[in-house]
Regions:
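Acidic, Ser/Thr/Pro-enriched low-complexity segments and adjacent helix/loop capping patches
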Residues: 1-74, 78-315
Length: 315
């Protein structure tokens, strides 16, 4: 058995990282089947429209953990892929309806609970979650538990509609139509543009997410690229930005024209002159990135060049 595959010598559980039971865990017992669905007589009951009466089955037997879709209407997804049957490994994320469950290791000394205790613990988790977020949607959680690229892939494959609201210091909104991202905005700053907003939001590594119902809102400009392409481009730009990040001043630090400016302006290209003007007009790296027509990485690289050649200085 490969190291990546769940070993039945360990104790495992399904941890709810979104949905009604967010924060709760369902222990998995060896040589047992767990039937998941909407019907009240099943092992794990998920009462919601997108879950079939008998939706999926998880089996722990013969040295492996597997999941099987039971002919559900809306499908069963593992790590963003719709599956009929799949072998699970630790860390896998399962999407059923609006619940995301993660296969986790419980530890060698996990307390043994009977079925009634398990259900009681889940209901306690549901009560805590409801008390914290009484008005929240059924699909909500923390980015630390499910990174945004993974979440967007799940939503894309399962063709979800709605608005994914992501909050850390800022609030980002990603609009979905049949799972496809068609618009994004940060703090209602539509001037930033949907592509730049999306590329920034997907890099956030901490905060809360919530999938809200679709809004009857139209936008002048929509994103046309497939979600997979948007995600690949966003991750590429993130890698490039991290490469130069340590050389850049903090986003909100002051940028000012060098006084005296010893190098002649004629040495600068048209793009460099544009960025120099933005630095003069808005006075910070964030101001430059927000107002430049270029992607953040390209604009930041030009700022870095201007700093090194002493056309601008960071205060």
């Amino acid at each position: 058995m490969s190291a990546a595959t769940a070993s039945v010598g360990k104790a495992y559980a399904l941890k709810f990282i979104s949905g009604k039971y967010q924060g709760g865990e369902y222990p998995l017992k060896m040589e047992r089947q767990v039937i998941i669905g909407r019907s009240s007589d099943l092992d794990m009951v998920l009462v919601e429209d997108m879950v079939s009466r008998k939706h999926a089955k998880i089996t722990l037997t013969g040295g492996k953990i597997t999941i099987e879709d039971l002919g559900s209407t809306n499908g069963t997804f593992v790590n963003g892929e719709k599956v009929k049957q799949a072998r699970l490994k630790e860390g896998d994320r399962i999407l059923i309806g609006t619940s995301i469950l993660k296969l986790v290791h419980q530890g060698d000394h996990a307390a043994e609970m009977d079925d009634q205790q398990v259900r009681q613990r889940l209901e306690e988790a549901a009560a805590v979650h409801a008390a914290k977020s009484p008005k929240s949607s059924s699909m909500a959680g923390k980015i630390e538990e499910v990174p945004l690229p993974d979440l967007l892939q799940l939503l894309n494959t399962s063709k979800k509609n709605g608005v994914l609201v992501v909050k850390n210091v800022e609030e980002g909104r990603i609009y979905l139509r049949q799972g496809r991202v068609y618009y994004a905005v940060i703090d209602d700053n539509h001037a930033l543009g949907p592509r730049k907003s999306f590329n920034r939001i997907v890099t956030w590594e901490a905060g809360d997410f919530e999938l809200r119902p679709a809004e009857p809102q139209e936008f002048m400009v929509e994103l046309e690229a497939p979600t997979e392409v948007l995600l690949m481009e966003g991750m590429r730009l993130l890698d490039e930005f991290k490469r130069i990040q340590n050389e850049l001043p903090p986003l909100n630090s002051v940028l000012m024209l060098s006084m005296p400016m010893t190098s002649p302006l004629r040495e600068l290209s048209a793009d460099e002159l544009d960025i120099l003007q933005l630095a003069h007009n808005y006075g910070s790296l964030k101001g430059v990135l927000d107002h430049s027509e270029k992607e953040d990485v390209a604009a930041a690289e030009i700022v870095l060049g201007l700093l090194k050649r002493d056309f601008v200085r960071a205060g």
